């Protein structure tokens, strides 16, 4: 399941993802299973235990929505998890955050913040332990289904099925992507080009226009026009494939939109000073682009206003911080307006879904 929900002041802020899993869970419980064990991510603890990312906080809301008790297990592997998986009477177990183990993603950070990788043998052992916790694998975590994580690709069961939420999401996306109303616009954000290379390539075969914003835009700007990006996010791996993406966009006659002005700060926190920079000035050393400026916001709104089908994956900036949220919020407002004008608007990706929920716009978009 995908219980990677936004938390504020020790409480679940938005229950959409938990609610989404309930139909599948209720259907499973109707079959009188010996027990049900739930796995999920929470936050980005980078392969180590971080208490603020514990899934324990989800239990009260899950119990309320299911109308039954949920047993929280303090680790996703080990003796406690194995013991819980052998319980009877239809017991529901929620395992602790999979991402507390480096073997889930295959990489993480050590205590000093240095990048580390999990060795193959430990990943193999981790996957075997997860597999031992059940007989049938149900994937209802659409938001993480694209990731090659152990819980997604490493569960060794003969019976592996999609849950109701997964099916609903896939059916909706298939219809929208196979027979879209045109013009068709895709909006991409997030940090790394390399993480979304397959998505970018496949969308270039389908769309008429593409907005590239957020952190990944700086990799494009540095490569494409040698723009000075200061200490903005830069994806070295993605840098190598920018030319290929731009060439394919030209071949397919897809118009690419990149930001033209930026709200910048010296750090990713609320105490950071704020400065405005554009393509002429560049971003100075020591500063990083953290949001789209007003000109970019207007250009994005114009592109959204032309589109009849819009897919949005990735915010335009560090929207969690007050002074860097306007680019993402203005984009959301433009999508809400275009939905009212009859466009089909689809939002995906954890951060973007959280942004929509935080601005109480879940029911103002198509999906």
Swiss-Prot record:
Annotated binding of (2R)-3-phosphoglycerate, by residue: 1-4, 17, 40-41, 43-44, 98-99, 146-147
Known catalytic reactions: (2R)-3-phosphoglycerate + ATP = (2R)-3-phospho-glyceroyl phosphate + ADP
Binding-site residues for Mg(2+), renumbered to this chain: 191, 194-195, 351
Binding site for ATP: 191, 196, 215, 289, 320, 351-352
Pathway noted in the entry: Carbohydrate degradation; glycolysis; pyruvate from D-glyceraldehyde 3-phosphate: step 2/5
Top-level EC class as recorded in UniProt: transferase
Keywords: ATP-binding, Glycolysis, Kinase, Magnesium, Metal-binding, Nucleotide-binding, Transferase
Highest taxon of source: Eukaryota
Residues engaged in binding ADP: 190, 214, 319
BP terms from Gene Ontology: gluconeogenesis; glycolytic process
Binding of CDP, residues: 190, 195, 214, 314, 319
Single GO term (MF): phosphoglycerate kinase activity
One Pfam family, short name: PGK
SUPFAM superfamilies in the cross-refs: Phosphoglycerate kinase
Enzyme nomenclature, EC number: 2.7.2.3
Cofactor needs: Mg(2+)
Any GO CC annotation of this UniProt entry: cytosol
InterPro entries, A to Z: Phosphoglycerate_kinase (IPR001576), Phosphoglycerate_kinase_N (IPR015824), Phosphoglycerate_kinase_sf (IPR036043)
Binding site for AMP: 191-192, 196, 215, 289, 320
Assembly notes: Monomer.
Family to which this protein belongs: Belongs to the phosphoglycerate kinase family.
Protein name per UniProt: Phosphoglycerate kinase
Organism for this UniProt entry: Paramecium primaurelia
